[in-house]
Structures are given as C-alpha cells and as structure tokens.
Amino acid sequence: MELSVYISNERIEIVAGTGSKSKAKIKKVYSLAVPEGTIMNGIITGEQRLQETLEQIWNRYSLPKKGICLVIDSGKIMTKMLEVPYMKDKELISCINKEFADGEKTDLVTDYFPFPKNSPYEMNHIFCAAVEKSVIESYLSLFADLKLKVKRISIGLGCLLRAVTATGMFAYETCVFMLVQGSTTISVLFENGNYIYSRRNRMLSDQGSAEWIEELGQIADGIRQFYRQRHSSYTIDSIYLAGIAGGSDDVVKEFDTHMQEYGIRAKAPGMIKGISFVKTAVSDHGEINAEPASYIYGIGNLLL
C-alpha cells in the first residue's frame, strides 16, 4: 500500500491505497487541518509547526512511514504542453529542460506526462512541469526529519491529468473541471476529452456563499470566452465541480442555476471508472462524506 500525500494552504489530504495503470483501490482517506501560515501557495513557510502537525497525524493514525508519494501544487510551478516526434527518454528530458531554460531560474526540477496516442503516426503530446529545486528539497527535508521515506514526488496538475486520461473520466466531453482547494480553485478545460488549458484563482468569498458562487461564475465565463476565441466546432456544455467541504450536492445545484444563462450545466463528477473508493474520509471532527473527484490528486498519484 502507498500513501499519496498532498498539503494545501489549509489541509493535508492523505489517500491510502494501491494502483495500477488505470485502476486504483482506495482503502482510507484523510482530510485534516494544518496550522494557518505553514504552507503558502505550495511553499513551506512554517516548517516547525508543520513538522509538529505531521508528527501528530502519523502517530495518531498509525500511518505507514514508507511508500509515501508526495503531491505538490503551487502557482510557482511552470507548465507547458509540447508536441514532439518520437524521442528516447534522454532526448525528451533534454528537450523539456531547454523549454524551461531561464536565466533567472537555472536550478529546476522537471517532470512530464505523455498523453496516449490514437495512432502510432501521431506526434507525441507531452504535459511538462518545472519547479525550483529548492521547493522539492524543502519537502524532502521536512519528511526526512520525521523519518518518513518519500518514494516519489508528483505535480498536482499532472496527477489530475493522469487520473482523467487513465480512467476516461471526461472521454469525448468538452467541459471544465473545477477543483476547489480551500481558498483556491483550479479550473481545467477539456475539448473532446483532451486537455486544453488550466488556470488557478484565489477566491475572495466564503465557500458556498452567494458571492462565492458569483466568483465561480465569473471564472467559468472567462474560460468560456477564452474557448470561443479558438473557433472550435465543440462547445462547453458542462462544468464539473469537486472539492466542496462536506459534499457538493447543494452547492452544485446553486451553481447550476447560476450557469443556466450561459447554456452550461453544473454537475458533480460522481464515481470514477476503475476507482474503488471509500464513502467517508477521516477529518478533525469525525467522518465526512468523501467524493472521489475531490481527491483526484491523490488518486492520480497512485496510477502508474
């Protein structure tokens, strides 16, 4: 069993389970608070307090100290889509490194995810990401001090795309997936099931409030207008909303009403094909409703 661990500004999400290329069996999920100010935009800013919190969590829930797979998400992570011919791994890595070459940021760690091809004659479409080495080292140092063994580190958006691609979650759909992570919302646009674009927004209003719904609507409308400029033969007809504290049903209904004027339906993603998931997650205040798509970073990190 592996532990997929993601720490946001407000919470630590732990997904415990096993996975293969397109299937995963999730045995336990945790969604627990971390002290305010310990993580800011994916950067560790309160190491001592965060270390104490993680130590308490591992001891309280008797979590494994090996097989830890970290997920990092931050606005500081640079991402690109590349279209390249077939290359050996070494050549591809060199190509990716050149794409992110920057005089001010020379010490970068890169990662990539190749999308499946429909034909061997197609060009390769590669999702690439890069982050400063110091960010990776800060996480490794934190977990090493706790004697927790990190097996691998992945990028949040890469995990999301891996999960969507491996499970056919939005196959043949032109839609937006909005993942709420506390006060941040990550929006990902898919055209006919293929990744097009993503953005992240800092939310100013309280989650679930009328003002918050209005903010979501503004984000969605911005993406809709961006997509119209592509003059595609497809149209956005659905928005899938996940990551709502305690469950998404009521919020999705309100958001759906708000989006009707644009001819777009808001929906909850529901179950994910090939993913065996638990019904509840462990929180600081007992068991809470758990929806698979809300933990898509953790799920995608197990699909290898």
Task: Label each PLM-derived region with a short phrase.
Residues V34-T38, S205, I272-T280:
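Surface-exposed loop and turn segments in beta-propeller and other repeat-based domains
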Residues M1-E99, I136-L140, T235:
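Non-catalytic, solvent-exposed interaction/assembly segments
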Residues E2-K28, L70, Y121-I223:
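Small-residue (GG/TT-enriched) beta-loop-alpha framework at ligand/catalytic clefts
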Residues I236-I264:
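Glycine-rich phosphate-binding loops at beta-strand->alpha-helix junctions
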Residues G67, V71-A166, A268-V282:
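Active-site neighborhood for divalent-cation/phosphate handling
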Residues S62, L179-N194, N289-L304:
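Extended, charge-rich low-complexity interaction segments
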Residues F255-S294:
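Conserved phosphate-binding/catalytic loops in two-lobed NTP-binding clefts
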Residues E215-S232, V251:
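Phosphate/ATP-binding catalytic cores across multiple sugar-kinase/actin-like superfamilies
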